[in-house]
Swiss-Prot record:
Gene Ontology cellular-component annotations: nucleosome; nucleus
Protein name, UniProt field: Histone H2B 5
Modified residues (N6-acetyllysine): K6, K13, K16, K21
Ranges for region Disordered: 1-35
Comp. bias regions, Low complexity: 1-12
Length: 126
């Protein structure tokens, strides 16, 4: 039985490095694609809570994954709530209800109060 021809190894799944093209004559240099994350915001909150504490890149990756997961859960639940009520817009009310449904007890209360505070601050600054 003939062996199949081996091709170049495929890049690992979840690889974060941007693929750069070799520069051709007359072409402009290609920029690396930006990878969005919540790391700067996680770092700012960490410094507010514990100014003398650092965070490893692995821990930051976990925190980024956590924030993305919670965001998707809240957005999904808010979307479902809007659909149930035959609405085409997700308002702060849907977000608040989604948070109450997803987060347990005291955590939900704190999240709702912080969210209300943030919305009030935003509307007053407009």
């Amino acid at each position: 039985m003939p062996e199949p021809a081996k091709s170049a190894p495929a890049p690992k799944k979840g690889s974060k490095k941007a693929v750069t093209k070799t520069q051709k004559k007359g072409d402009k240099k290609r920029r690396k694609s930006r990878k969005e994350s919540y790391s700067i915001y996680v770092y700012k909150v960490l410094k507010q809570v514990h100014p003398d504490t650092g965070i490893s890149s692995k821990a930051m990756g976990i925190m980024n994954s956590f924030v993305n997961d919670i965001f998707e859960r809240i957005a999904g639940e808010a979307s479902r709530l809007a659909h149930y009520n035959k609405r085409s817009t997700i308002t702060s009310r849907e977000i608040q209800t989604a948070v109450r449904l997803l987060l347990p007890g005291e955590l939900a209360k704190h999240a709702v109060s912080e969210g209300t505070k943030a919305v009030t601050k935003y509307t007053s600054s407009k």
